[in-house]
A protein has these predicted regions:
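Extracellular zinc-dependent metalloprotease catalytic-domain scaffold
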Residues: 26-182, 187-288
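Bacterial N-terminal signal peptides
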Residues: 10-23
Length: 368
C-alpha cells in the first residue's frame, strides 16, 4: 500500500494540498526492557528505536489485542537478533473458520479463496496447525497463555553493538536496529516456518508457501519456494539455505533488502512491505497507512523544504518529481527521502527543486 500526497510548485507561489486522516488503532504492543538494555549507555536511543518499530505496527493493524514482548541484548557473534515465542496446536478447520470470520482486506479474500475448507490442512494433510499466542488472539481465540518467562508472547534478543541504533547516522558496516526489531516482532506476531522445527504440522505462513509452478511446497530441498496468497503472484522468495530461517526471505543471490531477509544487508534500511501482507494473510487486520499532511513549504534559493505531520512512524518517505502531472507516478524521479520518527513529524529538503526554465514542477510524497 502506498500513501501519496501531491502538490505543485511554481517559481513564485507554492501551493500544497493538505490531507490528513488517521484510522483508529487498536493493536497494542507492550515492551519490557531488561537490565541489559536499561543499563546500556545508549539505552535511550535503543528504546526509542524499539518504540518506533512498535508504533509502526500499532498504526498499521487494528486488531483489538495486547501483545507483550521482553527485549534484551545478546552478544552472539554474527547474529543481529533472535526471537522466542509460544504456540498452540489447533485444528486447521477452526483456524480457517476464524480467518474467514476475521477477514477485512482484499489480501484476506484472495488468501481464503486458496485455503480449502475441510479438516485437513493443504500442506501436510494433517488436521492441525501451530499458531502463536499473539496470532491466536488476533483471530479471536483467547485464553491460551504463553509459557515463556513472565508470560510474554515473545522474547527478543538484539545484538546492539553490531547494529546502527538509529537511522540518523548509518555505518555501512553494521546492520539496522529498526529493521532487526521489526523482523523479530514479525516472528512474535506469527511469521515463521515449521520447517525450522523439522517439518510436521505447519505454522500459518507455511500455508502460503508455493513453488514457482503454483504448487504448494513444504521441503528444505531445492531453491524454489515463494510466499504467495494464490500460487500465481509470487510476492517474496523464501530462504531455502540451511542454517538460516526457512520462514525468512531469500538472500542467496542478488536481491533488494527486505525486513524479513534471512541475512541482513549491512548499511541498508528496509521497511516492512511484503511482511505486512503476510501478517494480514495469517490473521491480522491491515490498515491503510496514514495520510501525511504537508504543513509548510518554503523555498530557499532553489532548495525546497517540506515540513509535515502525521507521517507513519518508522516509515521512509520519498519525494518524487515531474514537470507533467499526467505522467504515471512510477515514471517520476525520486529526488529526496527521509525517515519518520515516533512523533510523525518530518522535514524533507529537496535540492535543486526549481530552475528558471520551468513554469511549474510537480512533486509527490510517497511512502516507500
Amino acid at each position: 500500500m502506498k500513501t501519496i500526497s501531491k502538490f505543485v510548485f511554481g517559481r513564485l507561489l507554492p501551493v500544497a494540498i493538505l490531507i490528513t486522516a488517521m484510522s483508529a488503532q487498536a493493536l497494542v504492543i507492550v515492551p519490557t526492557f531488561d537490565s541489559s538494555i536499561t543499563s546500556d549507555p545508549n539505552a535511550a536511543t535503543i528504546e526509542s528505536t524499539i518504540n518506533t518499530a512498535i508504533q509502526f505496527y500499532e498504526t498499521r493493524f487494528s486488531d483489538p489485542i495486547t501483545v507483550t514482548i521482553l527485549f534484551q541484548e545478546i552478544t552472539t557473534s554474527g547474529l543481529y537478533g533472535h526471537s522466542s515465542w509460544w504456540y498452540y496446536n489447533i485444528s486447521y478447520s477452526t483456524y480457517r473458520a476464524d480467518l474467514q470470520a476475521d477477514a477485512t482486506t482484499a489480501n484476506d479474500t484472495l488468501a481464503l479463496a486458496h485455503l480449502p475448507t475441510g479438516s485437513a490442512n493443504p500442506v501436510t494433510g494433517s488436521n492441525t496447525v501451530r499458531v502463536k499466542t499473539a496470532n491466536l488472539r488476533a483471530i479471536g481465540i483467547n485464553g491460551d497463555n504463553s509459557g515463556l518467562a513472565g508470560g510474554h508472547d515473545g522474547i527478543i534478543g538484539l545484538h546492539t553493538s553490531q547494529l546502527n541504533l538509529s537511522r540518523a547516522s548509518i555505518n555501512p558496516g553494521k546492520g539496522d536496529l529498526l529493521a532487526t526489531v521489526e523482523h523479530e516482532i514479525d516472528e512474535v506476531l506469527g511469521l515463521s516456518s515449521w520447517l525450522d522445527g523439522g517439518g510436521g504440522d505447519p505454522l500459518p505462513e507455511d500455508l502460503f508457501r508455493y513453488s514457482s509452478t503454483g504448487a504448494r511446497t513444504y521441503t528444505t530441498s531445492g531453491d524454489d519456494a515463494y510466499f504467495s496468497l494464490d500460487g500465481v503472484t509470487l510476492i517474496a522468495r523464501f530462504n531455502q539455505t540451511a542454517g538460516s530461517d526457512y520462514g525468512d526471505w531469500w538472500t542467496a543471490g542478488a536481491h533488494t533488502p527486505q525486513v524479513q531477509d534471512a541475512n541482513a544487508t549491512n548499511g541498508s534500511t528496509p521497511d516492512p512491505k511484503n511482511e505486512l501482507i503476510a501478517l494480514d494473510a495469517i490473521g491480522y487486520n491491515l490498515l491503510p497507512a496514514p495520510r501525511p499532511g504537508i504543513s509548510r513549504i518554503t523555498l530557499n534559493g532553489t532548495q525546497l523544504v517540506l515540513k509535515g505531520t502525521n507521517g507513519l512512524a518508522g516509515g521512509t518517505y520519498l519525494v518524487l518529481t515531474s514537470t507533467n502531472a499526467a505522467t504515471p507516478l512510477n515514471q517520476w524521479t525520486a529526488v529526496a527521502t527521509n525517515f519518520v520518527g515516533t512523533n510523525g513529524n518530518f522535514t524533507i529538503t529537496v535540492p535543486n527543486a526549481v530552475n528558471s526554465t520551468e513554469a511549474k514542477r510537480f512533486f509527490a510524497l510517497e511512502l516507500q
